Curated annotation (Swiss-Prot):
Residues 218-282 form the S5 DRBM domain. GO terms for cellular component: mitochondrial small ribosomal subunit. Keywords: Mitochondrion, Ribonucleoprotein, Ribosomal protein. This is Small ribosomal subunit protein uS5m. The lineage of its organism: Eukaryota, Metazoa, Chordata, Craniata, Vertebrata. GO terms for molecular function: RNA binding; structural constituent of ribosome.
Length: 429
């Protein structure tokens, strides 16, 4: 390959004289071929001129230094060259490490939760939309960015025109902007308990199991989403998401579980897939209410549930309403007092509902018929359960149960709890 030599200035060239002396002449370096320059360099370093005395070798040393510092060999203009520096940090670090440095995610501020404002830069996937073989010069490589065969002939390496290359680059930039715009769009989701709360939202059925079992008749509802932090010696204050969900099929089978992850969607997935493996079966009276009134205390949470007739509805805490719909309970009254911690409330509710006594169990334990008095039937009792064994002859003693009464219930039963607006007379309209 022929090479051309460019010089910054003029360089003294050595010529031989008749008297054995060396003369200096100023010649343009453009007139010297590259081979002669390389020959002069080799002569100065290894030839017979190096054997001269120190007084006469000074001009040759300056010539060698000028050749090494002021000369550069350029390649022809039709060839491309790419700078390669193996010692640069760009070639030693991964893309994630470079993004951490650009976004300042490796300092103490990121560990302490700083930098949450909107001015913070966001990470972009620069590889998205790129095609192997595409570059800024617009070369067409068969098998990479163009087909190998076209119209029955094998294509050769070609290059796009300048206008075509500008159009391709503009299309790529426009496509990336559309992706960013779609990413920023917020999809309107189902309303939960309140406007901007995760509570009460549906996550759909759990994922199919490894053996192929599906849970299409189950539904998952979010009860609580919390940010929790743990202090570690290596990372400092580490943030994670804790999610409490409940699942149920509306036919008595329901359960709950907790999922924790650094990403919110991962926590949702873990919680709903774990809850389906910890199910309770809740007995229901005529598939609409509980069998009897329940009063329980779980830790510092007090829950009092009452059986109600059909059409009463659910008048409870909003989390209890969500869980009862997943179970299949349609009519019930519940009052929560004390702590309203969501985890304690959920555990206490499942603890009480799973331990209720059915009418058949009560009849077998007492050895008597269990009857129900309904308002629409008058004084006629309705038998709802009979003992499987022998019927007991002596009736149940009429003893006053030793239970702690609620003062609010006593006032309601005695008519002492009245609304201040009950006797208000309104003007006729």
């Amino acid at each position: 390959m022929a090479t051309a030599v460019r010089a910054v200035g003029c360089l003294p060239v050595l010529c031989s004289g008749t008297a054995g002396h060396l003369l200096r002449r100023q010649h343009s370096l453009n007139t010297l071929p590259a081979a002669s320059i390389l020959a002069w360099k080799s002569v100065l370093s290894n030839g017979h001129l190096s054997s001269l005395g120190t007084r006469d070798t000074h001009p040759y040393a300056s010539l060698s230094r000028a050749l090494q510092t002021q000369c550069c060999i350029s390649s022809p203009s039709h060839l491309m060259s790419q700078q390669y520096r193996p010692y640069s940090f760009f070639t030693k670090l991964t893309a994630d490490e470079l993004w951490k440095g650009a976004l300042a995610e490796t300092g103490a501020g990121a560990k302490k939760g700083r930098g949450k404002r909107t001015k913070k830069k966001k990470r972009k996937d620069l590889n998205r939309g790129q095609i192997i073989g595409e570059g800024r010069y617009g070369f067409l490589w068969p098998g990479l960015n163009v087909p190998v065969m076209k119209n029955g002939t094998v294509q050769t390496i070609a290059q796009r025109s300048k206008e075509e290359q500008e159009k391709v680059e503009a299309d790529v930039i426009q496509q990336r902007e559309e992706w960013e715009r779609k990413k920023k769009m917020k999809v309107k989701r189902e309303r939960g308990w309140s406007g901007n709360s995760w509570g009460g939202l549906s996550l759909g059925p759990p994922d199919p199991g490894p053996s192929g079992e599906t849970y299409e008749d189950f539904d998952t509802r979010i009860l609580e989403v919390r940010n929790v932090f743990t202090m570690t010696a290596k990372e400092g204050r580490r943030k994670s998401i804790r999610v409490l969900v409940a699942v149920g099929n509306g036919k008595g089978a329901a359960g709950f579980a907790i999922g924790k992850a650094t990403d919110r969607m991962d926590a949702f997935r873990k919680a709903k897939n774990r809850a389906v493996h910890h199910l309770y079966y809740i007995e229901r009276y005529e598939d609409h209410t509980i069998f009897h009134d329940i009063s329980l205390r779980f830790k510092r949470t007090h829950i009092k549930m009452k059986k109600q007739p059909k059409g009463y509805g659910l008048r409870c805490h909003r989390a209890i309403i969500t869980i009862c719909r997943l179970i299949g309970i349609k009519d019930m009254y519940a009052k929560v007092s004390g702590s309203t911690n969501m985890l304690s409330l959920t555990q206490g509710l499942f603890h009480g509902l799973s331990r209720q006594e059915t009418h058949q169990q009560l009849a077998d334990k007492k050895g008597l018929h269990v009857v129900e008095i309904r308002e629409e039937c008058g004084p006629l009792p309705i038998v709802v359960a009979s003992p499987r064994g022998a019927l007991r002859k002596d009736p149940e003693p009429d003893e006053v149960p030793d239970i702690k009464l609620d003062w609010e219930d006593v006032k309601t039963a005695q008519g002492m709890k009245r609304c201040v607006w009950s006797n208000l007379k309104r003007a006729a309209t």
